Design a protein with these regions (language model features):
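Short beta-edge strand/loop motif at the mouth of beta-sheet-based domains
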Residues: 41-49
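Surface-exposed, charged secondary-structure patches
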Residues: 48-92
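Short, low-complexity N-terminal intrinsically disordered segments enriched in polar/charged residues
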Residues: 1-18, 22, 26
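A short gly/proline-enriched turn/hairpin at secondary-structure junctions
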Residues: 32-42
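Short beta-strand edge/turn micro-motifs at domain boundaries
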Residues: 90-108
Length: 108
């Protein structure tokens, strides 16, 4: 069954499964915030660096399997596999979207 993800969220997951940090950053608003592993990354440049650093640290793939909530604030569950401690794991991605860009993303 295909999930009905907002286009920018679909693009985020596609980009996150590559080594292209520019593609990841392009999904976000200029002043966006990402919270991952209890750290905040503010703005596109920091998000680009986060995307790059994440790929240098681990190899992983995220596969969304559930989405809830309104289209401007989707909550997505994804199965993540890779070479990180605790592999595999199901994570929750909480998005806030503004004007077809990701304004906030919290991963946990």
């Amino acid at each position: 069954m295909a999930l009905n993800l907002p286009p920018v969220v679909s693009e985020y997951f596609a980009a996150a499964n590559t080594d292209d940090a520019d593609r990841i950053a392009a999904c976000f608003a200029a002043d966006a915030n990402v919270n991952d592993e209890k750290r905040d990354f503010l703005g596109r440049d920091a998000i680009r660096q986060w995307g790059s650093d994440s790929r240098k640290k681990y190899t992983f793939q995220s596969e969304p399997f559930e989405v809830e909530g309104p289209s401007q604030a989707p909550v997505v569950r994804a199965h993540v596999t890779g070479d990180f401690p605790g592999n595999p794991v199901d994570l929750t991605y909480r998005f806030t979207l503004v004007k077809n860009e990701i304004a906030t993303l919290s991963i946990g």
